[in-house]
From Swiss-Prot:
GO terms for molecular function: acyl binding; acyl carrier activity. 4'-phosphopantetheine is transferred from CoA to a specific serine of apo-ACP by AcpS. This modification is essential for activity because fatty acids are bound in thioester linkage to the sulfhydryl of the prosthetic group. It is found in: Cytoplasm. This is Acyl carrier protein. The gene is acpP. It comes from Geotalea daltonii (strain DSM 22248 / JCM 15807 / FRC-32). HAMAP family: Acyl_carrier.
């Protein structure tokens, strides 16, 4: 697991209040981790801050799972 993967999983667990063991690459923020739309907005903001990037609203809507977040951050940093 890369340091980016690990940090994203830590942020997801912290933002959504779930155990890090639940944060698998395949986990959907809403379906598997119990996030609502506000949680996902806050999660995107935390990722933007951590990785010093800006995620457009259009792209943010496409980030639905942990793997989506990893792929996006990896491609944009």
């Amino acid at each position: 697991m890369s340091s980016i993967d690990k940090r994203i999983k830590e942020i997801v667990a912290e933002q959504l209040g779930v155990d890090e063991a639940q944060v698998t690459n395949e986990a959907s923020f809403m379906d598997d981790l119990g996030a609502d739309s506000l949680d996902t907005v806050e999660l995107v903001m935390a990722l933007e801050e951590e990785f010093d990037i800006e995620i457009s609203d259009e792209d943010a809507e496409k980030i639905q799972s942990v793997q989506d977040a990893i792929d996006y951050i990896t491609d944009h940093t």
